[in-house]
């Protein structure tokens, strides 16, 4: 660890950024119900799409992705190494999943991973986004697409951005853990489509 003070500052800011849930503010603006109490109960873009359509969902997606990208940019501006930038990205994603401002009840982290990934390893993230899009187009199930991309992430990172393999392993594990209910629903054939 080359910059302990800067890393502590960056991860603290990243966690707090991650804790600002775009879904809540988008739902307030569009007068939609609380996403944690409606639809799937997840404050993420897919649930917002079901509750309010493509415009609120797109705003939620961009908000959540921007948090991940901003965390990495802050770390870079503080002169942190790529490894330390990855640690900062993880802090933002944990903030999104366990937000301090929302009783630690957050989202699944896919969009925040997308933003952080584009800022850190755009080649891997772009490839995984194409995988996600192909599965959504083929099956119309967002969670299945996210799980497929998460399972492929370590291999894709190893091929395209091997310096970030450990980060993508950790992020994949986070995504899989946060989707455990979806995995059960998929196994039972009960997962909702878009």
Swiss-Prot record:
CC per GO annotation: plasma membrane
Keyword Cell inner membrane applies: yes
Gene Ontology molecular functions: acyl-phosphate glycerol-3-phosphate acyltransferase activity
UniProt xrefs under Pfam families: G3P_acyltransf
Pathway in which this enzyme or protein is active: Lipid metabolism; phospholipid metabolism
Keywords: Cell inner membrane, Cell membrane, Lipid biosynthesis, Lipid metabolism, Membrane, Phospholipid biosynthesis, Phospholipid metabolism, Transferase, Transmembrane, Transmembrane helix
Bilayer topology annotation: Multi-pass membrane protein
Enzyme Commission number(s): 2.3.1.275
Transmembrane segment boundaries: 7-27, 59-79, 86-106, 116-136, 157-177
UniProt subcellular location: Cell inner membrane
Record keyword Ribonucleoprotein present: no
The family this protein is said to belong to: Belongs to the PlsY family.
Quaternary data: Probably interacts with PlsX.
Name this polypeptide is given: Glycerol-3-phosphate acyltransferase
